[in-house]
């Protein structure tokens, strides 16, 4: 699902809100989440999951064109951990399909 599909689905169910208002709300939520992660904060949405930063240690990589070894610096990457309710819902949905 893309951001625009999310906005469309919300607009279908919330006819008292304009699509522009929904779009603004979704963009603001994502912006605030990005800001929080960029300052090292953890985000927890109960029943959905949590977002945090994980550190990737420096490592040696390879340039795919030349095969030359390249030292890659350590970096922080966003990490999502689904909550129990989310895990259960996904597992039930997938098991009922299969």
Swiss-Prot record:
Molecular function in Gene Ontology: DNA binding; structural constituent of chromatin
Top-level lineage group: Bacteria
Acyltransferase recorded as keyword: no
Keywords for this protein: DNA recombination, DNA-binding, Transcription, Transcription regulation, Translation regulation
UniProt record, GO biological process: DNA recombination; regulation of DNA-templated transcription; regulation of translation
InterPro entries linked: Hist_DNA-bd, Histone-like_DNA-bd_CS, IHF-like_DNA-bd_dom_sf, IHF_beta
Gene Ontology CC terms: chromosome; cytosol
Pfam families, A to Z: Bac_DNA_binding (PF00216)
Span of the signal peptide: none
Ranges of Basic and acidic residues composition bias in the record: 82-91
Stretch list, region Disordered: 59-98
Protein task: This protein is one of the two subunits of integration host factor, a specific DNA-binding protein that functions in genetic recombination as well as in transcriptional and translational control.
Subunit: Heterodimer of an alpha and a beta chain.
Family, per entry: Belongs to the bacterial histone-like protein family.
Protein name (Swiss-Prot/TrEMBL): Integration host factor subunit beta
Organism name: Saccharophagus degradans (strain 2-40 / ATCC 43961 / DSM 17024)
């Amino acid at each position: 699902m893309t951001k625009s599909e999310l906005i469309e689905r919300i607009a279908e169910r919330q006819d008292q809100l304009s699509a522009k208002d929904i779009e603004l709300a979704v963009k603001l939520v994502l912006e605030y989440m990005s800001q929080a992660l960029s300052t090292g904060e953890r985000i927890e949405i109960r029943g959905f999951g949590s977002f945090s930063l994980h550190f990737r240690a420096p490592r040696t990589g390879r340039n795919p064109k030349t095969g030359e070894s390249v030292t890659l610096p350590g970096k922080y990457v966003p990490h999502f951990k689904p909550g129990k309710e989310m895990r259960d819902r996904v597992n039930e949905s997938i098991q009922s399909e299969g």
